[in-house]
A protein has these predicted regions:
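Short acidic/glycine- and proline-prone juxtamembrane loop motifs at membrane-interface regions
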Residues: 112-120
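Loop-to-helix entry region of an early transmembrane alpha helix in multi-pass inner-membrane enzymes
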Residues: 53, 57, 65-83, 110, ...
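Signature aromatic-anchored transmembrane alpha helix within multi-pass, membrane-resident enzymes
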Residues: 99, 141-146, 150, 170, ...
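Membrane-lumen/periplasm interface segments of specific transmembrane helices
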Residues: 25, 187-273
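Transmembrane-helix signature of polytopic, membrane-embedded enzymes
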Residues: 86-107, 121-122
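Membrane-interface alpha helices of multi-pass inner-membrane proteins
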Residues: 108, 144-160, 166-171, 198
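Extracytoplasmic catalytic/substrate-binding loops of multi-pass membrane glycan-assembly enzymes
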Residues: 24-38, 47-61, 71, 211-217, ...
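Membrane-embedded, lumen/periplasm-facing catalytic core of multi-pass transferases
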Residues: 37-41, 350-413, 420, 434, ...
């Protein structure tokens, strides 16, 4: 297919990244978004190292231009897509493959939602570029060492799991150390390992001296062992979904209908696992390609380490978001290999278009004008003073539910989307605008005048 069609698709991707989030009911604001914003607002007097400072710091920098943390975070997401696409095109760095990659579920989810994974994937992309230049164009010396080491630091400053990618290059180095074809790369690669390790260790030391913990481990919840059986099942399903570039549906509760959906999705996951396996089995030249082997080792290392982390820390279940950093190098390596093969390129192009449209629609679910609601809520709180808390006091009111109809069998079921409830959305808008306000889970504050109640927001 002509490059022009990929350019058009990229512009569609960029257009979607700019406008689609405005029609998502919650605007892309999730619980972690509020944590990032609170950290950003507290700079330089930061009290927590639960999250690294990189993403909140950039939010704070853009806040000086927008005076609105929501739009600051949204600009970061848009710029990530813009820079990746423009850089790929002008540097001729796998442009077609990059456009396909930007259509996968991980980028749609991580860009439309205001989370640090979007920025992380962007930094990871540029890191891969430098390694590719190092292996294929003999880019050596400090022109490779310094930017690569700084990108490793940027990964770690964005997400602590960036250390998993650092561990991946250690494994990559050990695997290839004795290979004759790796001889010319040893010295510079080793210097990158040392310098990057120094940068990461320096930030860990900063955290330890200022917060008493290296990577926020002393501020995380302990592992809930009461539901370990269900957690294992859900995490297993999440891992099996890692190789699926299109579908990442994850119901919050198990019902007879959602179990059927999970079984159907599981079968599709198996198909994608087989297709990727067959792709690599048929094209064995990848074994001598350092870029692809680096991507695969990064994917596998990240997956293993995040699974281990899940069983020792109270982090999220292994869903699309948590596994995006593992899916990313796997997808990119498979897409590169696909384009190097004699397969019909129209197939992957139209699958990418479908993925973009489907995942955008999946996140929207029920189209709403988030920016309009944001303006309405902010107008109601603009003159409120001495407010310190937000509390949802209408939890007993029937929550909004969406009806889903199943074709063929002519059945329907209702599903309650937690992030589409009015009180939840309003609370996120309020706290993102006024980070000094804290969310109350229980109405325990005696001074009711300091509380914004959800029932007060019309």
């Amino acid at each position: 297919m002509s490059e022009k069609k990929y350019i058009y698709l990229y512009f569609a991707i960029l257009f979607f990244a700019i406008f689609i989030p405005s029609f998502i009911s919650y605007g892309g604001i999730v619980a972690d978004t509020l944590s990032y914003i609170k950290i950003a607002d507290s700079i330089p007097d930061v009290k927590s190292n639960l999250f690294p400072l990189g993403y909140p710091l950039i939010i704070r920098l853009f806040h000086s231009l927008t005076d609105d943390y929501y739009f600051s975070a949204r600009i970061i997401s848009i710029l990530t897509v813009l820079l990746i696409g423009v850089f790929s095109y002008f540097k001729k760095f796998f442009f077609k493959e990059t456009v396909i990659l930007l259509c996968t579920k991980i980028f749609v989810f991580c860009i439309y939602n205001l989370i640090s994974e979007g920025l992380f994937l962007g930094i990871f992309y540029f890191l891969i570029y430098y390694f590719h230049e190092f292996f294929t164009k003999n880019k050596k010396g400090w022109s490779f060492i310094l930017p690569t080491s700084l990108l490793f630091l940027a990964l770690f400053l964005t997400r602590y799991s960036g250390i998993f990618i650092y561990i991946a290059i250690l494994i990559f180095f050990l695997i290839n150390y004795r290979k004759p074809t790796f001889k010319n790369y040893k010295k510079d690669f080793f210097v990158v390992i040392i310098l990057s390790g120094f940068f990461l260790a320096s930030y860990m030391l900063y955290n330890f001296l200022n917060f008493g913990g290296i990577m926020g481990e002393n501020e995380r919840f302990s592992v809930d062992k009461t539901s370990i059986g269900l957690d294992i099942i859900r995490n297993f399903l999440g891992v099996m979904n890692l190789a699926n570039p299109i579908l990442g549906i994850k119901p919050a509760h198990f019902t007879s209908i959602t179990i059927i959906i999970e079984i159907f999705l599981f079968l599709i996951n198996l198909i994608f696992i087989y297709l990727i396996y067959h792709l690599f089995k048929k094209n064995k030249k990848w074994k001598s390609d350092f870029t692809i082997t680096f991507l695969l080792i990064s994917s596998a290392t990240y997956l293993v380490l995040v699974i281990i982390s899940k069983f020792f820390q109270g982090i999220e279940e292994l869903n699309t978001r948590m596994l995006s950093e593992s899916s990313f190098p796997l997808f990119l390596s498979a897409i590169i290999l696909y384009f190097q093969s004699d397969y019909n390129k129209k197939i992957i192009f139209y699958l990418a278009v479908f993925s973009l449209l489907f995942n955008a629609a999946y996140l929207i679910k029920i189209p709403q004008n988030f920016l309009k609601r944001k303006a309405e809520v902010e107008n109601q709180i603009v003159n409120l003073k001495d407010k310190k808390y937000y509390f949802d006091n209408i939890k007993n009111v029937e929550k909004s539910r969406k009806e889903y109809k199943i074709p063929i069998i002519n059945k329907s079921f209702y599903y309650e989307h937690g992030n589409q409830q009015k009180a939840y959305i309003d609370g996120n808008i309020i706290i993102s605008r006024k980070p000094e306000i804290n969310l109350l889970l229980k109405d325990t504050v005696k001074n009711k005048k300091s509380v914004i109640f959800s029932s007060d927001i019309k």
